[in-house]
Amino acid sequence: MYRMLDMNPASIGHWLPALVKANEGKTFFRIPKTTIAKAPLTLLQLSRVEYESLTAATLDVVDRWAQAAFRLKPDESYFLKTGTFSNKYDFRNAHVTEPHEVMQIGEYLLYLQSQAVEMAGPLSQPATYGVSTTNEMVVREYIPDTHDLPTIYMGLPLRCEYRCFIDCDTDELLGIHPYWDPKVMNHRFRDWPDSDNPHMRHDAVTYKLREPSLMREYEATKDLVATHVAGLLPGLDLAGQWSLDIMRDGDDYWLIDMAPAERSTFYEQAVPKGKRRPMMENWIPELGGKH
């Protein structure tokens, strides 16, 4: 099972090295510094235990593993995720800034994995399966917000983001879509069952006020982003169709995430039906020895 987790093409250890190589020698896009570690099986198993039941001694072991694996600096600010899941929608647990928080990054990472497990549980409506099907834990450089933008999701700056859909077999840009799509965002904050939650009320107002300038920024820059994404594709050594997320901060454009295209939101809106080719996945690792 552990080796099957290694087979997930969406895991960052699969696509990030190829993206870094494709961006070498180019100056338009930046990529945050990233450290990826394979979590021990015993650590992954802890996410199946109620987080509140874990003892201080257990959490201390997890923290010491993280300090050794990621070579953390107490005065740095970090963005945390598993190989496939960051839960930016609970940003206070994805972004650590204070020295005491950095010392507890192992706990934060374990909590992220536990959140992913809970999303597939019977108390989660709707239930979401497989968001953290990975054995990777990831610590990334945090990209500071240089424009003091309003925040949603308990601390996430509402910066302009772009979701590009690309075909790595044909080196073709299939489409581009605003990550913070107004129809999706307004529906999320106003129509979901938790819309009366104070955080959601805050986010509904914040997004509505930011929406006009956010969409103007997107429309003014999307062609520029698309042109530079197209320039990456000949050197991007991946197979199949992918989504590629870009975040703007001032004059900087950051390549921040990838996923198989058909698993990604806005796939049907951005990719023409005749161009869609879902990825063929292989989850069976090659085993050594005689058969």
Where are these regions (language model features)?
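Generic hydrophobic/packing signal
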Residues: K88-N93, S243, A259, R263
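C-terminal active-site "lid" helix and adjoining low-complexity regulatory extension at the edge
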Residues: R216-D223, T227, P234-G240, R248-H291
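Active-site flanking residues adjacent to catalytic metal/cofactor-binding acidic residues
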Residues: L80, L244, I256
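Conserved protein-kinase catalytic-loop segment immediately C-terminal to the catalytic Asp
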Residues: F165, D245-R248
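Active-site nucleotide/adenylate-binding loops and adjacent lid/helix of ATP-dependent enzymes
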Residues: M1-E161, F165-A230
